[in-house]
């Protein structure tokens, strides 16, 4: 997939990074990778933003790696995403039935329309051809972006327990008994 590349130099890169992160929140799907100034010998960027989903794959663990390989072969472009722990169920003869309140897919990857890399004071925009006319406008918008102020609230947070306190203590006591017997280790 062809991308248009434009490079800009930015004086106040930390401000730009903060503006970029806030600017990205208008999109439903984003990946934000930030080294947090940790220096590595082979790093090709300090920060990367992938956003504005063009194509994606979302699947359960069954044949997840085969589906990902097919998606990657068809896309022939940058893809970003995650592989959940439960994908192991297709690789090994294992199974887990852990509670999943968030209901994430077992595997999700997407092809971004917009990619922005920061290295030092250099900012590179890698946009798909269909949106490359937005590079200059986006750059200016990010530069001028006013960070929203977050209002503090004093409302109490209510946490709903999944198990009762007594049941939790009972499970911990059983686990500690196993540790003391040497059946399992910390």
Language model regions located:
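Signature of the chorismate-utilizing enzyme
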Residues: 1-186
């Amino acid at each position: 997939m062809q991308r248009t590349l434009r490079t800009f130099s930015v004086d106040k890169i930390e401000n730009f990074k903060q503006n970029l992160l806030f600017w990205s929140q208008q999109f439903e799907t984003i990946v934000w990778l930030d080294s947090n100034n940790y220096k590595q010998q082979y790093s090709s960027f300090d920060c990367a933003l992938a956003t504005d989903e063009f194509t994606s794959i979302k699947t359960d663990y069954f044949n997840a790696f085969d589906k990902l390989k097919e998606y990657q072969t068809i896309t022939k472009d940058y893809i970003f995403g995650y592989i959940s722990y439960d994908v192991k169920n297709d690789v090994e003869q294992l199974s887990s039935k852990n509670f999943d309140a968030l209901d994430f897919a077992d595997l999700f990857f997407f092809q971004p329309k917009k990619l922005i890399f920061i290295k030092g004071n250099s900012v590179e925009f890698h946009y798909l051809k269909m949106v490359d006319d937005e590079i200059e406008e986006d750059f200016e918008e990010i530069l001028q972006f006013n960070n929203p102020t977050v209002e503090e609230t004093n409302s109490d947070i209510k946490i709903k327990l999944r198990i009762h306190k007594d049941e939790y203590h009972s499970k911990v006591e059983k686990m500690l008994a196993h540790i003391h017997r040497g059946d399992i280790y910390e």
